[in-house]
Amino acid sequence: MKGVLSLSLLPLLAAPSPILVDTIHRDAAPILSSHNSKEVPDSYIVVFKKNVSPASAAAHQVWVQDLHTTVMAKRSLRKRNQFPFKNDAFDGLKHTYDIAGSIMGYSGHFDEEVIEQVRRHPDVQYIEKDSEVHAWDEPVTENNAPWGLARVSHRDSLTMGTFNKYLYAANGGEGVDVYVIDTGTNIEHVDFEGRAHWGKTIPTGDDDVDGNGHGTHCSGTVAGKKYGVAKKANVYAVKVLRSNGSGTMSDVVKGVEWAAGAHLSKMVEARKKGNKAFKGSAANMSLGGGKSFTLDLAVNAAVDAGIHFAVAAGNDNADACNYSPAAAEKAVTVGASTLADERAYFSNYGKCTDIFAPGLNILSTWIGSKYAVNTISGTSMASPHVAGLLAYFLSLQPEQDSAFAVSPISPAKLKKDMIAIATKNALTDIPADTPNILAWNGGGSSNYTAIIQQGGYEATRPGNKAAQLTEKIEKLGQNTASQLGAIYSEIKDAFTI
């Protein structure tokens, strides 16, 4: 449902976002900058060409750090000689990247003189200005029950009899690792039952703790005992955002790289030992910023490595294609729906949105204690419903008698299956270019084959019921007023479902 993103340079330059920063050097690599994001001053992400080998990449990274050191020494000398110069401190090389062999590069904080030499180096395909990212959420203080779990397990709109009933397979998520790339996770929370683990902290100097709550909330929706979709899955916290809920694109890319590496290591070990207890990996990223080709490529590379990835569409009531990682075509991009089966007023939309899931007034785990909960809203809350579903469906495979140690289903196949079985046309306020698809978990079945064979489902809309009842009235003609009153009561009820 998303357009193909080519790795060639021409599409990068032709795309309206990010924009190209002009260069006076004909052969210099372009510097990309997003028009709808806040840039981090003098910070860059450098991406190598496809033909650059790991050895050449390592040599280049040594070269750029040496170049940075030399330039900084010259600046220090000018300062001692009292020549006027811009008194800035530059940190040099920050992260190096190698995401499953699909994308290599590095990030850093560099002086203009350094970055100009980097641009003219033959290894470099493009440079992207680092930018801020932030969690997609809109805090709400209302303490409602987790209706979102009930909604993804029922086909039609929730009623008084179904709004708090979640139908699920008891072992849903078992054997699956889910990387929650966010603000961290309160791994001591009782709802995780010891299945939450600290994976990696990316921001320099930050602590291994969720000081914000956003990541903990997402993790609870993925895998909590009470609040989670996949109640037996393991959660690994990958902290890329600081306690204020913001961070940098370069840190997020590094977090994606770490998750991909951890997944590949686990998968190789499982296949080597024939360990059927490990079914595979999923990931959730409920964050975003302006359009970043590098982040989109990083997510796509992680998917190619085998991670089933869910990302939030964004909360700007705008086209998701203008945001990253929402525009990463190999991930599952998730918009937010409401209890009334509407598109949430804040949810992004468009052809880059693959599916919708509950995202308004979602109750889940929180920080502050082992028992804390909170209700918040956003596509950040919708995405972990789908990440949980990815883990849930992965855990149903392979079958017990399978020769495979790890689920053989690819991320592309599972994404296709999830969309195929989803509930169609269930939501209102869906723009014409946006798929009207609501996520579904199979209604509690543990037989993946049977779930897929059911196929999709066309939701029963209140408007259709009203039309049927109107036709019924016309046929009745001259019935008594009391009979007509009863029918009109039915019409009223149909509109208020």
Curated annotation (Swiss-Prot):
CDD domains: Peptidases_S8_PCSK9_ProteinaseK_like
Glycan-modified residues: 244, 284, 447
Source organism superkingdom: Eukaryota
InterPro entries linked: PCSK9_ProteinaseK-like, Peptidase_S8/S53_dom, Peptidase_S8/S53_dom_sf, Peptidase_S8_His-AS, Peptidase_S8_Ser-AS, Peptidase_S8_subtilisin-like, Peptidase_S8_subtilisin-rel, S8pro/Inhibitor_I9
Positions of the propeptide segment: 17-136
Disulfide bonds: none
Domain called Peptidase S8: residue spans: 146-452
Gene Ontology CC terms: extracellular region
Top EC class, one word: hydrolase
Keyword set, alphabetical order: Glycoprotein, Hydrolase, Protease, Secreted, Serine protease, Signal, Virulence, Zymogen
A GO BP annotation: proteolysis
GO molecular function: serine-type endopeptidase activity
Pfam families according to UniProt: Inhibitor_I9, Peptidase_S8
Compartments where found: Secreted
Active-site residues, record numbering mapped to chain: 182 (charge relay system), 214 (charge relay system), 380 (charge relay system)
First and last residue of the signal peptide: 1-16
UniProt main location, coarse: secreted
Enzyme Commission code: 3.4.21.-
Limits of the Inhibitor I9 domain: 43-134
Function: Secreted subtilisin-like serine protease with keratinolytic activity that contributes to pathogenicity.
Family designation: Belongs to the peptidase S8 family.
Protein name: Subtilisin-like protease CPC735_031240
Organism name: Coccidioides posadasii (strain C735) (Valley fever fungus)
